[in-house]
Amino acid sequence: DDRRQVRLLDFGLAKSPDATRESVSMSGELTGTWHYMSPEQTLAKRVEVDHRADIWALGVILYEILTLRRPFDGKNQHQIVYEICFKEPDPLQRRNTKVPRDLVTICHKALEKDPAKRYQSAVEFEQDLQRFLRWEPIQAKPASAWTRASKFVRRHRRESSLVAVALAILASV
């Protein structure tokens, strides 16, 4: 706006926290903006959806701001849902090498597949962003080497399998 304040206007379809049914159309299709749905909001996950789904959507928006691309951008709804549930987004720094490491960590924490690993409130998310802007240490921690390696293997299953077989052959010689 004219005071340089960001205004968030829409996350898609509103849903009452007391609602017992998912947001489903008359034809039985899940409704909403697919690219911003958290894993637990998609058809593939049948778990309780709470405010942490909004943290996910904010993480998607932050990722888009930093890379000018969506983290999950399949060709159709099924592919988008699959990517949201089972694939990791391309590492943010691969898409924009100028993004500081702490901001990458903040964004990836907001995009954790498991809601328990995400920021637990918008206040927590905002506080880490404020710490980043003040050059203070952030609360979010980067993924461990083990976590990064396991995510790499999941993203590159075929190549990882070939390397493992080659190493096994070399070890047996």
Where are these regions (language model features)?
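Conserved protein kinase catalytic/activation segment
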Residues: D1-L9
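Activation segment
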Residues: V6-R7, A14-D18
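Alpha-helical transmembrane signal-anchor helices
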Residues: V153-V173
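Flexible, glycine- and charge-enriched loops at secondary-structure boundaries
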Residues: S27
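C-terminal lobe helix-coil module of Hanks-type protein kinase domains
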Residues: L9-F11, T33-R154
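Conserved catalytic-core motifs of eukaryotic protein kinase domains, centered on the activation segment
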Residues: P17-E22, E48
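Conserved, function-defining core regions and hallmark residues within catalytic/recognition domains
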Residues: L30
